[in-house]
Amino acid sequence: MTRDEFIQVMGDLMILAFRTDLTRVATIMSSPERWGSPLKVHGLFDKPVDHHGMTHGQGNQHVRSKLESLDHFHIQQFTSLVMKMKDIKEGEGTLLDNMMFTLGSGISDGSLHIYTDLPTLIAGGAGGAIKPGRHIKSQNGTPIANLWLSMINAMGVNIDQLGDSTGKLKLS
């Protein structure tokens, strides 16, 4: 099974679980994050590659181009699943209107193992609890846990702290 097929099958299972109310929370790991794990993406790489190793070669334009292609691939997969959720009617809106679907990474600069300024994309409206269509730039040093805490609060779970959170982000 190719990586895109795998992501779409896992996404379809996630959507089915949401539609049948089997769960309200799901995670899809689109690629292995273990060091040295071979990554094969049909049409992108001729043979399996070491994604982790590639991130340490960002100074090489050829490697950087491959990494950018891989990022584009993940955005395409995310978008495909978002469009499926947008097409599913649910109550007065759609499945996407009533949920939050997040794409992110655990590292912002793989060559230096930097885990701040993490690019994160949220699709959906959480039943009106978040305002879509915006770019939010947090202050330097803001932990990603602030986003997770804010998302949990948007889902109706009223807690004040999560991991190393230092506050909440304004999502609405």
Question: Can you describe what each PLM-predicted range is?
Answer:
Residues 1-172:
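Ligand-binding pockets and gating/stacking loops
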